[in-house]
């Protein structure tokens, strides 16, 4: 199927998404995710799969695409049905664009919003909006296997949550430590 026709099908199937302006890189990522669904004559549904938050505290949005939350109505078998998917994070750029800064398979995501008084003071001192000053968002991926630092021969396979951190030098997100303290029931 040619790209213009696929774009037309995605735009027809996703009027809310088509009316919202996302950076080209994000729209291309969503289109790639929707392609098998559209080709199977399903209707892509991204409402739960796309989240916008400032994860690297630069004042620009990050676009979190969680493949485990993508739904293909009418052609469910066209997409991964094992409860997982690829998580992609696109970092917002000052020119309004975005670039891919992380991609990894996961069982899902958990976005934790928090507040920092130190960040609030810095935000307000820099002329930031007092209503949003101090807001922090941290993204956790629900993963399993070696990422949970478990010995597969002696420990049962069970998921854990791993936080992502921003590596400013590499300009990408990376895994940081094992965090199983946040209950997995909160992530759904």
Annotate each language-model stretch with its function.
Residues 18-24, 35-39, 113-188:
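Acidic, small-residue rich beta-repeat scaffolds with periodic aromatic anchors
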Residues 1-4:
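Positively charged n-region of N-terminal signal peptides that target proteins for export
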Residues 19-24, 74-104, 158, 162-170:
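Beta-propeller blade repeat segments, especially FG-GAP/WD-type strand-to-loop junctions
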Residues 59-65, 136:
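Glycine-aliphatic tripeptides that mark coil-to-beta-strand junctions in extracellular
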Residues 50-58, 129-130:
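Acidic, divalent-cation-chelating loop motifs in proteins
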Residues 99-106, 175-181:
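Beta-propeller fold detector
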Residues 13-15:
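N-terminal signal peptide c-region/cleavage motif recognized by signal peptidases
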Residues 64-72, 86, 142-148:
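Generic short beta-strand segments
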């Amino acid at each position: 199927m040619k790209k213009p026709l696929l774009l037309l099908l995605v735009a027809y199937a996703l009027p809310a998404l088509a009316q919202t302006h996302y950076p080209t890189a994000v729209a291309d990522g969503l289109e790639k995710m929707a392609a098998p669904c559209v080709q199977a004559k399903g209707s892509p549904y991204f409402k739960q799969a796309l989240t916008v938050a400032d994860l690297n505290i630069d004042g620009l949005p990050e676009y979190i695409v969680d493949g485990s939350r993508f739904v293909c109505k009418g052609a469910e078998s066209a997409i991964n049905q094992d409860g997982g998917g690829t998580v992609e994070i696109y970092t917002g750029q000052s020119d309004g664009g975005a670039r891919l800064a992380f991609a990894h398979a996961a069982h899902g995501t958990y976005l934790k919003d928090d507040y920092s008084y130190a960040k609030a003071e810095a935000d307000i001192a820099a002329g930031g909006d007092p209503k949003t000053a101090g807001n922090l968002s941290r993204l956790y991926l629900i993963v399993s296997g070696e990422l949970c630092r478990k010995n597969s021969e002696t420990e049962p396979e069970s998921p854990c949550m791993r936080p992502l951190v921003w590596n400013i030098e590499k300009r990408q997100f990376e895994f940081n430590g094992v965090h199983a303290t946040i209950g997995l029931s909160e992530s759904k």
